[in-house]
Amino acid sequence: MTRRACLGAGLLTLLAALCSGPATAAENWGQRAGGKPWVVYYADKEPVEAFEGFRLLVLDSETHPPLRPLSERGKVLLGYLSVGEVESHRPWYAKVKRWGILKDENPNWKGSYYVDLRDPRWISLVVEELVPMLLRRGFDGVFLDTLDNPVYLEQAQPQKYKGMTEAAAQLVRAIRRNYPAIPIMMNRAYPLLPRVERDIDFELGESVYADYDFKTKSYKLVDQPLYQEQLKLLKDAQKRRPELRVMTLDYWSPADPDGIRRIYKEQRANGFDPYVATIDLDRIVKEPPP
């Protein structure tokens, strides 16, 4: 795994990366892994053989199947990394809490706290410790989650969180600058796309067409206005950068194979690479046969 030799140079290296222009990935990971079945799985119960039909795997950074046999089978492995929030069960939570840069608890996810991306210590931790940790474990690259949060916080309280959106973009650029050869997938964070779409290989549209309603505890189609809005944002990104692979993660009940087929058909017609899962992401849901 190729990395920049300057990784250990500390904040000076990071600041230089933040001020630099985009560093496009050295390898076309989208071409290598895109257009093929892929999966998101945040557990460790499934045997290696269960992943046989998939090329790209997004796995939890700590709870996951053995990585070496998956890599030996040619799988592209992305490790989950929440960079807009810190969960209380993560090993680095106590350190970040001591720094005083944790904000409110996410009302939808108990024990997960928004983090102030404007603090250079957070960027340093992600780039110099967390990403290398994933690569040492055997992941090829990273799946960046919760980058919607800094955008949301700045929109909701522009004075208090001024600069959070740009800080999120700078974090993505810093990862790419320090790791030019690894695959990077970003989850949603659509307003960041014009700033970072040349620094990532995959953009994930989560809950674009189908979602889970936690109040009714049921799966449902996304309202048409929201679906069309997301569709436009993703297609616009594809037009600006054709090399960018757009993946979709929709949620539906495995007890309704016809519904799952409908989602796959819809997203492929959109030009995206779909996967349909249960909301817990703790089991592999194979695409139903035609």
Model-derived segments and spans:
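Glycan-processing catalytic domains of CAZymes
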Residues: 26-290
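N-terminal export leaders
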Residues: 3-7
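Sec/Tat signal peptide C-region and signal peptidase I cleavage site
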Residues: 21-25
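Bacterial N-terminal signal peptides
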Residues: 9-18
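Disordered, low-complexity tails and leader-like regions
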Residues: 1-2, 14
